[in-house]
């Protein structure tokens, strides 16, 4: 933090603005939240997307959803005895935005960095914030014959759900109110 504060002060002296990368979709599997969620410790139990085995699917996978980086988007946790969802790598479990506590956590994170003097945020992986709560299988796209390739499926249940706009509006409104509309910028990946 000391390094960041020194860099921030040096940037201000030069009239530069600081925009941080903000990835609200997932955390590391080593993050305290995930470790506690995996152990079913409250209030973190539902901070991530956990599902039981579905014995009607190969490998017991909850459904056919694919990771952006190939293969199933589900990883088995021996500790919890359930699968967790990851749109990207298994080391990056997706946060559960259907849990209101996650929304509050994101506001706390933005608040922390605004208080540290950040001038804006570039939000990454935004279209991946919500998934179909019914876990419906995604349809085959016809774009490739490789069933491990992300493009094998049409991502109608894991990408750009209408609720994404609601979350973006909530976060943007928080930043606007917090800063009095002073020009802290929010950029989102589309």
Regions found by a protein language model. Give the residues of each.
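Hydrophobic residues within beta-strands of alpha/beta enzymes
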Residues: 121-123
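Acidic/aromatic-lined carbohydrate-recognition and catalytic surfaces
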Residues: 1-111, 115, 128-190
């Amino acid at each position: 933090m000391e390094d960041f504060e020194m860099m921030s002060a040096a940037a201000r002296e030069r009239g530069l603005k600081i925009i941080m990368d903000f990835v609200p979709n997932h955390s590391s599997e080593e993050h305290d939240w995930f470790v506690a969620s995996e152990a079913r410790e409250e209030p973190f139990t539902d901070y991530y997307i956990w599902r039981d085995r579905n014995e009607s699917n190969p490998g017991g996978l909850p459904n056919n959803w694919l990771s952006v980086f190939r293969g199933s988007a589900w990883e088995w946790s021996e500790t919890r005895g359930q699968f967790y969802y990851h749109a990207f790598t298994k080391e990056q479990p997706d946060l559960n935005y259907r849990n209101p506590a996650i929304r509050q956590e994101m506001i706390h994170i933005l608040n922390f960095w605004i208080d540290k003097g950040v001038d804006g945020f570039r939000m990454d992986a935004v279209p991946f914030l919500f998934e179909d709560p019914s876990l419906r299988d995604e349809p085959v796209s016809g774009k490739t014959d490789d069933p491990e390739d992300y493009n094998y499926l049409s991502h109608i249940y894991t990408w750009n759900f209408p609720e994404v706009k609601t979350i973006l509006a909530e976060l943007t409104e928080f930043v606007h109110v917090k800063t009095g509309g002073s020009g802290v910028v929010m950029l989102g990946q589309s």
